[in-house]
Amino acid sequence: MSTYLLIDTSTSRTSVAIVGDGKTLFASHHDGALSHGEALPELVAQGLKLESRIDQVIVGMGPGPFTGLRAGISFAQSFALGRGISWQGVCSLDAIASQISKSDFIVAVDARRKEVFYARYTDGSRIGEPKVCQPSQLAVFDIPIYGEVSNQYPDPTAFIAIAESGAIYSQPIYVRRPDAYPAPIGVKFRPMNQLDLVPIFSIERSAYGKEAWTMAQLKEESAGKDRM
């Protein structure tokens, strides 16, 4: 049987598992919405110490915030390419739904910007594609809601069964457009410096209110390797 490297970075949690011959050989995670890029290689390295033979990679394709999602997908694709093996993508919400035994329910995860990504499941099957809305709008369904809000995250060990069912994705499930857009013609760029943090903080607060990063978070992010 094949040995799988399973990765998910669609939520604030970075999750990695290695499953071989139907047994979970490694499973670990790291919590932190801003640390996917740093945590993922470390978790994979830990897993490879226990099982270095990987036949296939399966990665959660979202929906999820753009930056974290891309960290996992890019890593999975690069790892597979480097080893000359195949990779597949699955819906991360399906891996939360696999943990729920109810017959009719919603799975919702934080989409930031005061929104959630969600999907409805009936008798174990997802109804349509994932969507995005404000949390208060989910009340109209009048059915149980599970997911990140109740401390439930995608279980990567469920990815194998999901992929085998044929519910695979070759492109990220963004649901909404990324926050980044092509630059207007004629705009010039320069490296960011510490003096820019004050106006950046002001813009962040104006745009996102209570959801905005704190000055401490901005300083920590800007001080990271290759940030400026």
Identify what each model region corresponds to.
Residues 1-26, 31-39, 88-186:
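Oxyanion-binding and handling regions
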Residues 40, 211-220:
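A short, aromatic/hydrophobic, helix- or strand-capping loop or linear motif
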Residues 44-56, 140-142:
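Phosphate/pyrophosphate-binding loops at sites that engage ATP/ADP/AMP, CoA/4′-phosphopantetheine
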Residues 56-87:
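DPxDG-like acidic metal-binding loop motif
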Residues 188-200:
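A short beta-loop-alpha structural element at the N-terminal edge
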Residues 201-205, 218:
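Hydrophobic alpha-helical core bundles mediating ligand binding, dimerization, or RNAP-core interactions
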Residues 206-210:
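N-terminal first-folded block
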Residues 222-228:
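A short helix-loop-beta-strand connector motif used in the catalytic cores of GNAT acetyltransferases and
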